[in-house]
Amino acid sequence: MPEHILVAVAWPYANGPRHIGHVAGFGVPADIFARYHRLRGNRVLMVSGTDEHGTPITLVADKEGTTPQAIADRYNKIIGDDLYNLGLSYDTFTRTTTANHYAVTQDIFRTLYERGYIIRQETLGAFSATTGRTLPDRYIEGTCPLCGYDEARGDQCDNCGSQLDPTDLINPRSKVDGQPPVFKPTEHFFLDLPAFAEQLHDWINRQDHWRPNVRNFSLNFLKDLKPRAITRDLEWGVPIPLPEYANRDDKKIYVWFDAVIGYLSASIEWAQNSGQPDAWREWWQNPDARHFYFMGKDNIVFHTVIWPAMLLGYGAGGQFGADPGGKYDGIPLQLPYNVVSSEFLTMEGKKFSSSRGIVIYVNDFLSRYDADALRYFLTIAGPENQDTDFTWAEFVRRNNDELVATWGNLVNRTLSNVYKNFGSVPQPGPLTPVDEQVLAEVTGGIETVGELLAAARFKAALAEAMRLAAQVNIYLSEQEPWKVIKSDHERAATIWYVALRCVDTLKIIFTPFLPFSSQRLHEYLGYNGYIAGPLTFREVTEANGRTHRVLTGDYDRWVGRWEPSVLPVGQVLRQPQPLFKKLDEKVIEEELARMQSRLG
């Protein structure tokens, strides 16, 4: 029975292009997971979009003398193009400035407010001393009063995990201009997190399958749980849906509150765009559905504490949660099943910094290198369980010594020889024990790699796939069919047949990681149809007449299945080309020089 799998991907912020450190944390792992489950025949809904509200976008707009909407429009397109070129197979990649998102966000706010889970409190708001604008909590840094860490943020300390307010910090300073923020009394709306403390604690304690850092960080956060502000004094954001704010433009819903709601609103938009307005309920109100959230470690508590609290408070209520007389009447929205958090990626030993030039944007990278080469590196050497460093030397080494030399070499030597000598899948003779052993080992990879992917252990899964490819290379080197063919044509045909079967099975195993090259290999092997593409953009017109673009794909047409090869004898091959490019080591110095030029 196919499972319903929600793949909820962190929303990239639309105040600039995204760099490779961003997609290492949220994009590539989520796509690997989604592609695997589609190959398994499960019903996958992968959603996200650009996060387009808040002060950072207004700061960029002010600097350029334009509007926040213009900035959001620009970077929504740039980011969408980058994710398309990287092959991230969203069912819907949308944005938070749609009428649909506003409606869902306001419904959740209103429902929580009516149920007493949103309360009013007077507090000290942080404002920039130079611009007078509200400073987001994450734009304020200072010393943690509990552990002394001097780069604690205005919302939490990443060193000790404590929940903080900007006023808690010692010597707070603005990340915008380095000046101390100005604190002014102001009334805000707060999400009453302590009201959910016991439920959250019991629920998180039961999540034994979570990564230890996610579970421990979340439990630690619960120790000092307090109401969290969900509005800010600014003009750019989702309006507060209360009558007294109908004609006010000075206070909006805080960006973090509306961003996490985006997973739900994007699912609802997908259903509307597909002509099945209630189809989203199959994922959100189906007790058997499983929700997987992907993000960097700096967003853990938003997905393990704050968003679950909002879901618990909303339940099956409101305009969207209720399904009167329907299949899911009275069934609450589902909580996360797993929260897959990645660590941080650095670059040449330094923290990514756009302002300091220590960065390589996705679009810049893909203008010179293949997407699968980047996907390979970010998986095999990425920050899955610990902070890792991207260096150009390591990227070139991994590409040449692993991707090209192992998997690329196996495909090239097998297909080029078979195409030259047979032109189609050859008729094998009797299989020897050695033949059967290598076939069995690669076939077993469907299970072993699949188990690792299902557990979100992407690095180990890719390493196992590469080990299997290496075993087939060893088999060919020992059997030497290029020599055997001179004296025993049938035996050579058998060896190449076994190798082709292994390559065909490995093609499926590598597809979640390397979709572009896997699709080309699929075609070289003589197959038709898609196992990994294409993606597409679609223009959507809302009821208010506004249009926006979504990244999506017709994944129901994909023909690949997570099964061993059934490559038929006699299938005509297409002329193969090498799957991957070997990189000249001179690119290391060229790229380091580019980085140095950005540093000035």
Swiss-Prot record:
Binding site for Zn(2+): C144, C147, C157, C160
Location of the motif 'KMSKS' region: 351-355
Subcellular location: Cytoplasm
GO molecular function, one term: metal ion binding
Predominant cellular place of this UniProt entry's protein: cytoplasm
Pfam family, one: tRNA-synt_1g
Catalytic reaction(s) noted: tRNA(Met) + L-methionine + ATP = L-methionyl-tRNA(Met) + AMP + diphosphate
Name by which UniProt lists this protein: Methionine--tRNA ligase
Organism of this sequence: Chloroflexus aggregans (strain MD-66 / DSM 9485)
